[in-house]
Amino acid sequence: TYINRWPHIKWLLTVANDGANSIFRALRDNTDGAQDRFLSEIVRIMEKYPWCDGIDIDLERGDGYSTHTESTAMFCNIYNTVKAYDPAKHMNICLPGMTSVNGSVGGENWCVYGDLDAYCDTASIMSYGMAWAGSAPGPVSPRSWLEGIYDYATKVMNPDKIFLGMPAYGWNWQIYDTPENLGKTYRGTSNTYYAAKLWMTGGYNFTDDAPPQPFLPIVAYWDDYDKAPYAFPHVYDYME
C-alpha cells in the first residue's frame, strides 16, 4: 500500500464545505444541530479509516469579523473532538490569506490567525487567489501580498505550524469585451500551466477549431518582481 511504501507521509482526511457559505454558517451557529452532527461524523470517519493520521479541515466562505468569536469556537470544538478521540491524531486547518486582523481581500474576516493557533497542529494558508476569475488580470500571488501574509502569520502563530500555499495554476482572461456581452459570469477561466502552454502554442484557440489556427502569435513577459509569467495571445503588432 501507499502507506507502507511511504511511511514518512502523513495521510489526512479532508473535510470541506466546498465554499458554501450556507454550510459554514449552519456549522458555526449549530443550526438544527448541524455542528453536533458534523463533530460526530468526524469521529465516525476516523473510526472508519483508522489508518488516517488525522483530519484536514477546509471550511471556506465564512462571514465577516463580527462572527470571528463564534467561528473560533467552532474550530475549538472540532480540535477538541479530534483530540478527545485520539490525542495522536493530527489536525490541519486551511485558512484564507490575510495580512492583518480584518485584512482579507475576499471578505473572509471571520478568520483571526492568532485566535486559531491553539486549535490546530498545522495551518495551510491559502496564499493565492489575489487575482481570480472575476478580477483584472494580474499575479495570483503578488509578492507584496504574499510577504504581508507571511509577516502577519508568523507574528501571531507558531511559525512551525504554518504552510504557505503556492499557486500551480493560472488564468486565461478575455479582455476584449465585457463578461456580460460574452455570455459569461466572469472574464477569467482557470488554467493549469500545461493548458496555458497549449494556448501559447496553438493547441487551443478562440475559434473552436473552425478553422484551427496553427500559428498563434503571442507576447510573453516575465514579471521578475512578482515572479509571475504573462502571455498575451493574438498580438499581431510590435509590442515594446
What is each residue range found by the language model?
Residues 1-143:
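Chitinase-like catalytic core of GlcNAc-active glycosidases
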Residues 31, 112, 142, 158, ...:
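Helix N-cap and loop-to-helix transition residues
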Residues 40, 44, 118, 148, ...:
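Charged/polar, solvent-exposed surface patches and flexible loops
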Residues 95-98, 166-170:
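Active-site segments of SGNH/GDSL-like serine hydrolases
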Residues 124-126, 163-167:
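Short, conserved beta-strand edge motifs with alternating hydrophobic and charged residues
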Residues 128, 158, 169:
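Residue-level marker of positions within ordered structural domains that often coincide
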Residues 140-162:
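Catalytic-core region of carbohydrate-active enzymes that cleave or remodel glycosidic bonds
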Residues 168-240:
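Glycan-binding loop/region signatures in secreted carbohydrate-active enzymes
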